[in-house]
């Protein structure tokens, strides 16, 4: 079991470049872990909404860190090429949410205008 935190990033900054470097390293490490065990679980706050189902207001956030196409492409590979499973999505089905983060502004929690940025990825 691996617990991970990926910082949120910020478009056009070194912080975003660091986030991409971390996600790149995950692409290398995740298959290595799977070679050593049939049961690998990676959990944590990864600060990326993978699909439109993972963020309530996805259209307005397409150019913001956390929902950039480049970030989402890493998750396509985690759940595609590398073969990990998105446990929460499998349990919830193809429906919006369940969200794991809400802004403190604009009554986001009250309106369930959240993001799903926390994951349980399993082999």
Question: Which stretches of residues belong to each language-model region?
Answer:
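Metal-dependent phosphoesterases centered on the DNase I-like endonuclease/exonuclease/phosphatase
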Residues: 22-117
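Short, positively charged
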Residues: 19-20, 121
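Short, solvent-exposed loop/turn segments at secondary-structure boundaries
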Residues: 13-18
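Active-site-proximal beta-strand elements of phosphoester/diester hydrolases
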Residues: 1-10
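Anionic group-transfer/hydrolysis microenvironments
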Residues: 5, 47, 120
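Intrinsic structural disorder
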Residues: 2, 31-33, 123
């Amino acid at each position: 079991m691996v617990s991970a935190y990926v910082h949120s990033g910020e478009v056009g900054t070194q912080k975003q470049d660091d986030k991409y470097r971390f996600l790149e390293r995950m692409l290398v490490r995740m298959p290595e872990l799977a070679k050593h065990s049939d049961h690998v679980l990676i959990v944590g706050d990864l600060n990326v909404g993978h699909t439109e189902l993972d963020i309530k207001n996805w259209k307005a956030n397409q150019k913001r860190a956390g929902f950039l196409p480049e970030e989402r492409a890493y998750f396509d590979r985690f759940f595609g090429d590398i073969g990990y499973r998105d446990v929460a999505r499998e349990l919830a089905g193809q429906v919006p949410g369940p969200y794991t983060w809400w802004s403190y502004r604009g009554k986001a929690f009250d309106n369930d205008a959240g993001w799903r940025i926390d994951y349980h990825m399993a082999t």
